[in-house]
Structures are given as C-alpha cells and as structure tokens.
Amino acid sequence: MALKIRLARGGSKKRPYYHVVIADARSPRDGRFLEKVGSWNPMLAKDDAKRVELDADRIKHWLDNGAQPTDRVLRFLDEAGVAKREVKSNPEKAKPGKRAQERAAEKAQKAADAAAATAE
C-alpha cells in the first residue's frame, strides 16, 4: 500500500481549508484516509501561527514507515524542520528560447545596418 502525506480539501465554496492527511495513494483526494496529522488554512495571513499546523511526531512516524509527502506538504514540512526539501534549480529556464534568440539577432542586425547607413 503506497501511502501519501497530502492535502484533503474542506471548507466551503471560495473558502478553502485543507487537512493534512495520511492516505492510500489510490484513494480519492477528499476520500478515505488513515490519519489526520495537520491542517492548512490559506485564508489566514502568511505570518499567522495557525495558518499551518502539523503534528511533527506523527508525521515523522509515517515518513519512517515509507509515506511520501506531496510537493506542497513537503514545503510545509521543510518550513517546520521535519523533512528536507531539495531546492529545484533550472538555470536553462531563464535563457530565452530559440525563436526569441533569432528575433534578437535580427533586431541587432537591423540596428547595425541602420547605424551603418546613417554613418555613410
């Protein structure tokens, strides 16, 4: 049984509230779960202490038993110091794409041609 530490949505329409739960990966998002280990209220201010509440001991227990946290839950665990999140680094993403580089080269060529024409 593949276990996940994930968010289950609660609350009402346009007023989200999430429970941090231990659930089988095959069960529905808001469906059956084994244990509730925390909560996240995104409606509260980011610096509010009650925005994210976690039961660190139970989460460590489930992590030791093979439960895998989802990306968002892993962020919460990293902030709480329960688990370490690897920093994603993609330096290639900041570079312009092939078409953008071609357009920049054409623009530079036109500027150089215009400068040469005015110099003559």
Swiss-Prot record:
Q: What processes in GO biological process is this protein linked to? A: translation
Q: Which ranges are annotated Basic and acidic residues under compositional bias?
A: 84-110
Record's InterPro entries?
Ribosomal_bS16, Ribosomal_bS16_dom_sf
Q: Which NCBIfam families match?
A: S16
One annotated GO molecular function: structural constituent of ribosome
**Source species:** Rhizobium rhizogenes (strain K84 / ATCC BAA-868) (Agrobacterium radiobacter)
Q: What is this protein called?
A: Small ribosomal subunit protein bS16
Which Pfam families does the entry link to?
Ribosomal_S16 (PF00886)
Disulphide-bridged cysteine pairs: none
Tell me yes or no: is Zinc among this UniProt entry's keywords. Answer: no
Q: Which HAMAP family match?
A: Ribosomal_bS16
**What is one GO cellular-component annotation here?**
cytoplasm
Renumbered to this chain, the Low complexity biased-composition regions fall at 111-120
Residue span of region Disordered? 84-120
- Entry annotated with the keyword Cell membrane: no
* Annotated PANTHER family: 30S RIBOSOMAL PROTEIN S16, SMALL RIBOSOMAL SUBUNIT PROTEIN BS16M
